[in-house]
Protein backbone atom coordinates (compact mmCIF):
# COMPACT_ATOMS: atom_id res chain seq x y z
CA UNK A 1 0.00 0.00 0.00
CA UNK A 2 2.80 2.53 0.67
CA UNK A 3 4.04 2.01 -2.92
CA UNK A 4 0.55 2.77 -4.27
CA UNK A 5 0.36 5.93 -2.15
CA UNK A 6 3.77 6.95 -3.48
CA UNK A 7 2.71 6.38 -7.09
CA UNK A 8 -0.46 8.43 -6.59
CA UNK A 9 1.36 11.25 -4.80
CA UNK A 10 -0.63 10.72 -1.59
CA UNK A 11 1.12 11.74 1.61
CA UNK A 12 1.07 8.93 4.15
CA UNK A 13 2.48 8.07 7.53
CA UNK A 14 3.16 4.63 8.89
CA UNK A 15 1.86 3.57 12.29
CA UNK A 16 4.96 3.07 14.42
CA UNK A 17 2.92 2.56 17.59
CA UNK A 18 2.19 -1.13 16.95
CA UNK A 19 4.45 -4.00 15.96
CA UNK A 20 3.73 -5.18 12.43
CA UNK A 21 2.78 -8.83 12.28
CA UNK A 22 0.69 -10.15 9.37
CA UNK A 23 -0.90 -6.72 8.90
CA UNK A 24 -0.25 -3.08 9.63
CA UNK A 25 -2.27 0.10 9.84
CA UNK A 26 -1.58 3.00 7.48
CA UNK A 27 -0.75 5.90 9.77
CA UNK A 28 -3.61 6.92 12.00
CA UNK A 29 -6.24 6.00 9.40
CA UNK A 30 -8.83 3.24 9.39
CA UNK A 31 -6.99 1.47 6.54
CA UNK A 32 -5.05 -1.74 7.15
CA UNK A 33 -2.74 -3.64 4.81
CA UNK A 34 -3.87 -7.16 5.71
CA UNK A 35 -2.33 -8.80 2.64
CA UNK A 36 -0.78 -11.58 4.72
CA UNK A 37 -3.71 -12.23 7.02
CA UNK A 38 -6.77 -14.27 6.14
CA UNK A 39 -8.45 -16.07 9.01
CA UNK A 40 -11.81 -16.34 10.77
CA UNK A 41 -12.58 -13.39 13.03
CA UNK A 42 -9.99 -11.08 11.49
CA UNK A 43 -12.47 -8.38 10.40
CA UNK A 44 -12.20 -5.07 12.24
CA UNK A 45 -15.49 -3.17 12.55
CA UNK A 46 -15.27 0.39 11.27
CA UNK A 47 -12.00 -0.26 9.45
CA UNK A 48 -10.99 -1.13 5.87
CA UNK A 49 -8.70 -4.10 5.40
CA UNK A 50 -6.93 -4.68 2.09
CA UNK A 51 -6.40 -8.35 1.22
CA UNK A 52 -4.12 -9.81 -1.42
CA UNK A 53 -4.58 -13.05 -3.32
CA UNK A 54 -1.19 -12.81 -5.06
CA UNK A 55 1.68 -15.26 -5.04
CA UNK A 56 2.91 -16.19 -1.54
CA UNK A 57 -0.34 -14.98 0.10
CA UNK A 58 -2.71 -17.09 2.24
CA UNK A 59 -5.30 -17.48 -0.55
CA UNK A 60 -2.90 -17.84 -3.47
CA UNK A 61 -5.07 -17.33 -6.54
CA UNK A 62 -2.12 -15.61 -8.21
CA UNK A 63 -3.36 -12.02 -8.36
CA UNK A 64 -6.14 -9.77 -7.19
CA UNK A 65 -7.48 -9.01 -3.77
CA UNK A 66 -10.40 -7.62 -1.82
CA UNK A 67 -11.25 -4.93 0.69
CA UNK A 68 -13.15 -5.79 3.86
CA UNK A 69 -15.38 -3.11 5.34
CA UNK A 70 -18.40 -3.05 7.64
CA UNK A 71 -19.49 0.34 6.29
CA UNK A 72 -22.19 0.10 3.59
CA UNK A 73 -21.42 3.56 2.15
CA UNK A 74 -17.75 2.61 1.75
CA UNK A 75 -18.73 -0.73 0.18
CA UNK A 76 -21.00 1.07 -2.30
CA UNK A 77 -18.22 3.51 -3.27
CA UNK A 78 -15.69 0.70 -3.67
CA UNK A 79 -18.13 -1.31 -5.80
CA UNK A 80 -18.63 1.67 -8.13
CA UNK A 81 -14.86 2.06 -8.43
CA UNK A 82 -14.55 -1.61 -9.38
CA UNK A 83 -17.06 -1.12 -12.19
CA UNK A 84 -15.58 1.90 -14.00
CA UNK A 85 -17.46 4.36 -11.77
CA UNK A 86 -20.80 2.94 -12.87
CA UNK A 87 -23.86 2.69 -10.66
CA UNK A 88 -25.01 -0.89 -11.26
CA UNK A 89 -28.61 0.04 -10.37
CA UNK A 90 -28.79 2.15 -13.56
CA UNK A 91 -29.40 0.11 -16.68
CA UNK A 92 -28.43 0.52 -19.38
CA UNK A 93 -25.25 2.20 -18.10
CA UNK A 94 -25.50 4.79 -20.88
CA UNK A 95 -28.40 6.35 -18.94
CA UNK A 96 -26.06 7.21 -16.05
CA UNK A 97 -25.37 10.96 -16.05
CA UNK A 98 -22.69 11.21 -13.36
CA UNK A 99 -19.75 8.87 -12.81
CA UNK A 100 -17.24 8.53 -10.00
CA UNK A 101 -13.63 7.57 -10.63
CA UNK A 102 -13.47 3.94 -11.68
CA UNK A 103 -10.78 1.37 -12.31
CA UNK A 104 -12.38 -1.75 -13.82
CA UNK A 105 -10.95 -3.84 -10.98
CA UNK A 106 -12.92 -6.99 -10.47
CA UNK A 107 -11.96 -10.64 -10.48
CA UNK A 108 -12.76 -12.91 -13.37
CA UNK A 109 -15.43 -15.57 -12.86
CA UNK A 110 -12.66 -18.18 -13.08
CA UNK A 111 -10.66 -16.51 -10.29
CA UNK A 112 -13.80 -16.33 -8.12
CA UNK A 113 -14.46 -20.03 -8.65
CA UNK A 114 -10.82 -20.89 -7.90
CA UNK A 115 -10.89 -18.83 -4.69
CA UNK A 116 -14.18 -20.32 -3.49
CA UNK A 117 -12.91 -23.84 -4.19
CA UNK A 118 -9.68 -23.13 -2.31
CA UNK A 119 -11.61 -21.74 0.67
CA UNK A 120 -14.02 -24.71 0.70
CA UNK A 121 -11.19 -27.27 0.55
CA UNK A 122 -9.05 -25.46 3.11
CA UNK A 123 -6.31 -25.00 0.52
CA UNK A 124 -4.79 -22.03 2.31
CA UNK A 125 -1.23 -21.36 3.36
CA UNK A 126 -0.72 -21.72 7.09
CA UNK A 127 -0.54 -18.55 9.13
CA UNK A 128 3.08 -19.10 10.14
CA UNK A 129 4.16 -19.01 6.48
CA UNK A 130 2.79 -15.46 6.33
CA UNK A 131 4.96 -14.13 9.16
CA UNK A 132 7.12 -11.34 7.78
CA UNK A 133 9.52 -9.06 9.55
CA UNK A 134 8.69 -5.75 7.96
CA UNK A 135 11.61 -3.35 7.53
CA UNK A 136 11.40 0.19 8.83
CA UNK A 137 9.97 1.75 5.68
CA UNK A 138 10.46 5.27 6.96
CA UNK A 139 14.13 5.05 5.97
CA UNK A 140 13.64 3.51 2.53
CA UNK A 141 13.97 5.78 -0.50
CA UNK A 142 11.66 5.01 -3.41
CA UNK A 143 13.21 5.80 -6.77
CA UNK A 144 10.52 6.86 -9.21
CA UNK A 145 12.57 6.25 -12.37
CA UNK A 146 12.75 9.89 -13.39
CA UNK A 147 16.14 11.03 -14.62
Model-derived segments and spans:
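Active-site region of PLP-dependent enzymes
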Residues: 36-147
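Conserved PLP phosphate-binding loop immediately N-terminal to the Schiff-base lysine helix
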Residues: 10-52
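Substrate-binding/gating loop at the entrance of the active-site cleft, primarily
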Residues: 1-10
Amino acid sequence: IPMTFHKLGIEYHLDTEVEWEYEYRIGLTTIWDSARLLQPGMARAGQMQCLSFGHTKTLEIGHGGAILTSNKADADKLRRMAYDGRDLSISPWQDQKEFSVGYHYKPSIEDCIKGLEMLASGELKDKESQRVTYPDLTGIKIWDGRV
